[in-house]
Amino acid sequence: MDDLLLLSEAQMRRIEPYFPLSHGVARVDDRRVLSGILFVIRNGLRWRDAPAAYGPPKTIYNRFIGWSRLGVFNRIFAELAGGSDTSDRLMIDATHLKAHRTAASLLKKGLLPRCIGRSRGGLTTKLHAVCDGSGRPIRLVLTEGQTSDYKGAAMLVDTLPPAKAMLADRGYDADWFRKALAERGIAPCIPSKINRKVQISHDRTLYRQRHRIENMFARLKDWRRIHTWYDRCAHTFLSAIAFAASFIFWLNQ
């Protein structure tokens, strides 16, 4: 059992203010349950297979679903990542995440979008992210797998914090995006598309740092329930991503 994940007391102190208070019968220790949630997400387990050390699997699952619906994990991520809103450079990119057949069922429940679409990789979801200069995610959004990069950028551009430069690949080379960045005082470091009539130069030395956002996606995808998602609700999946990102990039700082 030495490989079990357990949040430290210091980590719990940083996130416990975001959870609703317990009323009535004392509930299973939050630290154990949250550690169990992270363990399931990291190892790609079914909820019923969560180790007994974390408490009853049903409790772990119900707590995750309930807190997801309340937006708890998204708030934790937003608050922890908000401390990086003074970065001098930002990076934006997107990656495909495979949808398991249990998530890709044609049966649609609820009013929220499923965020599952068909791309060259099959049924996928696309995760769009903005990172700070250290490669730590500060903004996350999900769309259908076939959504273009610049449409994802349109969903994120109004939320960008102040910065000096934005690093992005040529998939983001659109006049409207460059203009939106300039209006915010952010210099675009984006290679021009091949078919652009007048090529726009960019800082090649600075652009080499863009690998950090690729590394961020790689670290997230090491967590099996993020690499492939099984939940039928997009907001539940985004909660899993937000909590994993909070733990990997912010709670371990």
Residue ranges: model-predicted function:
Residues 1-253:
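Short alpha-helical elements
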